[in-house]
UniProtKB/Swiss-Prot annotation:
GO BP of this protein: intracellular protein transmembrane transport; protein secretion; protein transport by the Sec complex
Keyword Amino-acid biosynthesis: no
Annotated InterPro entries: SecG
Cellular component, GO annotation: plasma membrane
Function: Involved in protein export. Participates in an early event of protein translocation.
Organism: Rickettsia prowazekii (strain Madrid E)
Gene field: secG
Taxonomy, superkingdom: Bacteria
Gene Ontology MF annotations: protein-transporting ATPase activity
Keywords annotated in UniProt: Cell membrane, Membrane, Protein transport, Translocation, Transmembrane, Transmembrane helix, Transport
Protein name: Protein-export membrane protein SecG
Family statement: Belongs to the SecG family.
Main location group: membrane
């Protein structure tokens, strides 16, 4: 289960990096690579709005996924600690000498 969320987390991270780099900044960013200032049917404002909304959505998904991963990891660690304690108790009980 954690593997699935980890894969989703990595995918969201990569998409978030791409979307952030595509946004126009003071120096133009990666969006200026195409060389076309004339966007044709899609205006620069529309692309900017789409990238802004995409960034917000991906950031929200990233944070939610990070919280879920943290909770799953904490639960898995607590289960592991309880199993270790149980094994230690069983070994301690088995190693005690029996008085006759």
């Amino acid at each position: 289960m954690i593997d699935i969320f980890l894969f989703v987390h990595i995918t969201i991270s990569i998409l978030l990096i791409i979307v952030i780099l595509m946004q126009r900044s003071g120096s133009g960013g990666i969006s200026g690579i195409s060389g076309d200032n004339n966007m044709g049917v899609v205006s620069a404002k529309t692309v900017g709005n789409f990238l802004s909304k995409s960034t917000i959505i991906l950031t929200t998904l990233f944070l939610i996924n990070a919280i879920v991963l943290a909770n799953l990891s904490a639960k898995k660690q607590s289960d592991l600690v309880s199993k270790i304690n149980e094994i230690e108790e069983n070994q301690a009980d088995n190693s005690l000498p029996i008085a006759k």
